[in-house]
Amino acid sequence: MKNIAIIGAGMTGLSLAYNLQEHNITIFDKSWRPGGRVSTRKHDNYLFDHGAHYLSTNHSVNQLNEVISRYNLGQIIEIDFAIDFLKNKKTRKKIIIGQNGMNSIPKSIFDNIKVKSYLNSKIIKISKNSNELFSLFSEKEEFKDFDYILICIPYLQSKELSKELIDFTQIVSEPSYDPIHTVMLSYKDINNINVKAGLNLHKDISFFMNQNIKFNELSHDCWVLNMSSEYTKNNIDIDKPELEKYAQSIFEETFDIKNEISFIKSHRWLYAQTKVSYNSISKKNWINSKDNKIFLSGDWVLGKSLSDAWDAGEKFSHYIKILSI
């Protein structure tokens, strides 16, 4: 049995923890809760899935389906979906959502695997000790005696944390991300919008989704808008009020909304979704140190979806099992 530290409690980190439960696992995350970008925001009586919006029913990661079924984490709903709103292409679409928001999926997995964890703990340094074991350091604490360190955070953050321990000259081409501004907005009265989610609402808004179809307790009309990655990159440091006003104006003009807005807030995801995956440029499923003790993984290995993140962890876990025999 090995002592294994997992840095990052997103879907890849949770997948690793789930698949390596025969070892002594400790999970670290800078956030106060697990899930990473599978995030549900609560503001007063408003609820928004402002990270991952849903899980496709067509994904091919069998173990993730098994976990969702085993712990009763999701439900399938069918909604009116715009395949391309600007071209008026619409369909009925089945999607998987969390039982209580998308974050309830990783949170329930985390609660069920019952591993040792340190949330609200940002790891800022990794060092190798004289006994060939590793220590992790947050700003306040040291965590000792780990056999393996599995880093499951966005690639650039992983690289910065492990640059003294991994030879990154071996990486000829690096994975990349697209940033996305997300806008959450709510109206006191329900708007009569006949499509519940979709793509290409506007040249600057790549995705939109109603939240009332996920949270039955919502009395106000709540929506999440994703600005396009191109718009976000061109306006990466835009003032939030300016961004929110712009997104609101597009949304209201598109759907001829006359109701008064009751809430609006934006969030910038610098590492919103994988643009170029590591596997697509290297044919590899992780990055490792020469001594096979420090590893990097994440959704950026395989793709941009929630299922890609889980799949990256599951694939990687098989190698760790072989190493630790």
Whereabouts are the PLM-identified features?
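A conserved short coil-to-beta-strand element within the FAD-binding core of flavoproteins
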Residues: 119-134
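Flavin (FAD/FMN) cofactor-binding core of flavoprotein oxidoreductases
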Residues: 252-292
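Short beta-strand to alpha-helix junction loop
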Residues: 54-62, 87-110, 237-243
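Glycine-rich FAD pyrophosphate-binding loop
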Residues: 7, 19-43
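N-terminal FAD cofactor-binding segment of flavoenzymes
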Residues: 19, 40-81
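Central helical "cap/lid" subdomain
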Residues: 35-36, 146-196, 257
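Beta1/beta-strand and adjacent pyrophosphate-binding region of the FAD-binding site
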Residues: 1-12
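Active-site substrate-recognition segment that forms the wall
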Residues: 184-235, 246, 250-255
